[in-house]
């Protein structure tokens, strides 16, 4: 998977760097792990921290095993995912190392189905807190219609692609889908992936 390839790359190039893994799907849980819950006849993933910060060099195998154990089951509660990422970044040592959040997503932000403005706005607000703490946020969309082409202004862009730009550091001052601030990169900016 792309995430395991990323872990391999970081482990080889920067073994002292630390990586945490967060999954986002259904209800929010403050437990660390890969837990699920039942709702009627269906089983869903919690949105939770799967692995706390772990050294990439010595912990790569454990990190990759945690990623490989993840299976889709539930909505795309990106707001909860970004809130967990924000708590990790806020709790990380201020050791002068660059802090980065990479959000991989396969769908529209929601707690049920379709594009949910409330979930998108909460994810954008959490991302703003991450960016305000000096971290860079990258977004990677693996969904139909994903188009990370750099665009400024964001008029005429699908909600999902606009959202991906606003969560990313392309728009450092974005606080919601309607309060985007200006592009961090005038003239079009950078792509999300």
Indicate where each model-derived feature is located.
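…and closely analogous acidic/polar surface helices at protein-protein or active-site interfaces
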Residues: 1-21, 115-120
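Short, charged loop segments at secondary-structure junctions
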Residues: 4-14, 25-83, 108-111, 133, ...
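Soluble periplasmic/extracytoplasmic beta-strand elements of cell-envelope proteins
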Residues: 6, 18-23, 100-104, 136-138
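Surface-exposed acidic, glycine-flexible loop patches that form ligand/cofactor-binding
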Residues: 7-14, 86-97, 128-129
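Secondary-structure boundary/capping residues
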Residues: 15-19, 94, 176-177
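Low-complexity, intrinsically disordered short peptide segments enriched in small/polar/basic residues
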Residues: 19, 46-47, 154
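Short amphipathic secondary-structure patches
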Residues: 57-62, 91, 121, 125-128
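VWA/integrin I-like adhesion module and closely mimicked acidic/polar interface patches used
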Residues: 75-76, 80, 87, 98, ...
């Amino acid at each position: 998977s792309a995430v395991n390839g990323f872990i391999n790359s970081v482990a080889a190039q920067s073994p002292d760097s630390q990586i945490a893994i967060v999954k986002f799907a259904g209800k929010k849980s403050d437990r660390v792990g890969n837990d699920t819950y039942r709702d009627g006849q269906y089983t869903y993933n919690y949105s939770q921290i799967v692995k706390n910060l772990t050294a990439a060099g010595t912990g790569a195998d454990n990190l990759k095993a945690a990623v490989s154990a993840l299976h889709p089951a539930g909505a795309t509660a990106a707001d909860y995912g970004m809130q967990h990422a924000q708590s990790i970044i806020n709790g990380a040592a201020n050791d002068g190392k660059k802090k980065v959040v990479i959000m991989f997503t396969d769908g529209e932000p929601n707690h049920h189905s379709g594009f949910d403005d409330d979930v998108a706005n909460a994810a954008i607000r959490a991302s703003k807190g991450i960016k305000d703490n000096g971290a860079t946020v990258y977004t990677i969309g693996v969904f139909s219609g994903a188009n990370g082409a750099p665009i400024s202004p964001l008029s005429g862009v699908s909600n999902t692609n606009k959202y991906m730009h606003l969560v990313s550091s392309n728009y450092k001052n974005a606080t919601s889908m309607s309060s985007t601030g200006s592009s961090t990169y005038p003239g079009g900016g950078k792509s999300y992936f």
